[in-house]
Each structure stands twice: as structure tokens, then as C-alpha cells.
Amino acid sequence: MPIATPEVYNEMLDRAKEGGFAFPAINCTSSETINAALKGFAEAESDGIIQFSTGGAEFGSGLAVKNKVKGAVALAAFAHEAAKSYGINVALHTDHCQKEVLDEYVRPLLAISQERVDRGELPLFQSHMWDGSAVPIDENLEIAQELLAKAKAANIILEVEIGVVGGEEDGVEAKAGANLYTSPEDFEKTIDAIGTGEKGRYLLAATFGNVHGVYKPGNVKLRPEVLLEGQQVARKKLGLADDALPFDFVFHGGSGSEKEKIEEALTYGVIKMNVDTDTQYAFTRPIVSHMFENYNGVLKIDGEVGNKKAYDPRSYMKKAEQSMSERIIESCQDLKSVGKTTSK
């Protein structure tokens, strides 16, 4: 299927909310990782989201260029073409973008999509993330207002983060002592500033103890009930029913999370979950095994010539793609999206 249109993306998110499941959002940095994501989604018969961080996009542009926008555009172009060969729907998203790089990433990408829409074409991306967790909440939401208006005009969904996700993402680190739990006051301020959809649809990355990176199970202290508290704040403020889920939540920093906590978060309106650390490991592990198992072949030692079949990048990149795709299927299972593609 072609990359999801804005209408299809909205339908995907609506179905996830109604069905109590979420889509894995897989961070990709190359054609190989994009292929792995598409393969995993297709084998799980799950729609999904492919996303590029600022660092991933810069990497995608090549060492000689190192340009976030050029890398994101190039990776998106590959994904648009590659997705046509698969029978599932996939949306393209850009991950964490902090204030200091907005002008180098999200703002120019929004402008590119607006130009496409003005020509009668579809936007290049279906959603973008603004990460204002490092600035005061009022400034965070003021910038969110600006970006949401631009996103709405280009038929794009905005993702907004309130609160701080611990750990490190693309070199940006949040200390454990930071505010890792979004407060009821911040939920209320969010509604006051950007509404609940009438000013443009947005996804909300509220924090409930999430931590980026790799941690042993049990070392991530999640409190999904924070998300329930956010929904309760919105219900009361908007006069909605007790079972309403007005916020579309995103789960960040889920590596090492207990399965039960993930399932609980789904009941509170999580419809997107970022997956990066686990798929990075899944991609790298078989490459390491290949190098150890073919040590004398991948290296030219003591005057020997090695084995071309062993050091041909295709020999180990195929294994990496397969392993990563299998880990993505596991994420689809965890998030209950298996077999629920809207393309059926």
C-alpha cells in the first residue's frame, strides 16, 4: 500500500482508540531498517508508524552531508516507494525535536509538506513531534500552538510532549530527578492552549515514569494511572462521560517495561508506542554473531585474503533485517495490533 493518506492515518488512530490497541512506532535510520519495519508490520498484519529522529535523519543524509532535513526527505522518499510492495498501511513521523533544532528540522519539513499540499499533493509526513519537555510548560504550549496551526494547514498531526522522559535520546539526556510524571495542572493547561482536536489533531506524549534507553525489567517505575488522571481531568473540564478518552496518548521510553504496565496504558488511551532501543539491539545482535562466527573470513589476517562471502555487507545485513523484523512482530503482539490492519 502507498504511505497512508491523512484520512487513512486518522482512521488508523481512531480504530486503535476504539479497539484498545496501539501502533508500534519504529525508529529507522536507513533503507535496511525501513525494510525491516515494513517486513515486520506485514508479517504481523499490522499497520504501523515509521519514524526518524533528528539524529537518525542526519545519519540518513550521509557523513558528508549531515543535514537533518535532507536525510528525512531521502528516507521518506525511500519509504514511500518501498511501502507500495506491502499490504499494510504505514504512516511516516518525525521523532523528538527540541526547541534548538526546530528551525533545522520540523519547521522546514512542515513547509515542504505545505508546498506539496498547495500543489494538490499529499504531505510528505503524516505527523511530526515537537518535544518541549526541556522548556517551561507555558513556552512549550505556546510553541505547540504555532506548530499545530501549521500542521493542521498541511493535513498533518502534531505530537506534543508534556513532562520529561528520563534517560537519553539522541544525545539529549534527562536526569532521573526531573519531573517524570505529568501533573493534572499540565493536562489542564494543554487543553486550554491547544484544545482537544478542534484546533487540529494532536498526539500527547504525557510522562508517567518513562525512561529512554535500556533497563532491566522492573527498573522502570511506570505509573500508567497518570494517564488515567489526565483523561479524568479532560472529562471533567469538557463535561464528557466517565468512559471517554479525549486524549490520544503516546508511550515513550518503553524498553524494559513490564508487559502488564503496557497493557494497562492501552486501556487509558495509548494508541502509539515508540520502539527504538529494543530494535537497535535486535538489528545489531546477529551482526555481532556473524563477525564472531566468521572471524577469519571477515578479516584479512596473517597475509590471508579473508572470505568475500563473509564480509559482503549483504551477508550480515540480511540477518539484521530479519532479526529486527521479528522484534517488531513482538511489539505488535505486545500492543495488540496483530491482524488489525485497516487495509483488510
From Swiss-Prot:
Pfam families: F_bP_aldolase (PF01116)
Example of a GO MF term: fructose-bisphosphate aldolase activity
UniProt: dihydroxyacetone phosphate binding residues: 213, 253-255, 274-277
Residues the record marks as active site: 95 (proton donor)
Record's keyword terms, sorted: Glycolysis, Lyase, Metal-binding, Zinc
Top-rank taxon: Bacteria
Enzyme Commission number(s) from the entry: 4.1.2.13
Residues at which D-glyceraldehyde 3-phosphate binds: 53
Listed pathway(s): Carbohydrate degradation; glycolysis; D-glyceraldehyde 3-phosphate and glycerone phosphate from D-glucose: step 4/4
One record GO biological process: glycolytic process
Catalytic activity: beta-D-fructose 1,6-bisphosphate = D-glyceraldehyde 3-phosphate + dihydroxyacetone phosphate
Cofactor comment: Binds 2 Zn(2+) ions per subunit. One is catalytic and the other provides a structural contribution.
A single cellular component GO annotation: cytosol
Protein name: Fructose-bisphosphate aldolase
Annotated source species: Corynebacterium glutamicum (strain ATCC 13032 / DSM 20300 / JCM 1318 / BCRC 11384 / CCUG 27702 / LMG 3730 / NBRC 12168 / NCIMB 10025 / NRRL B-2784 / 534)
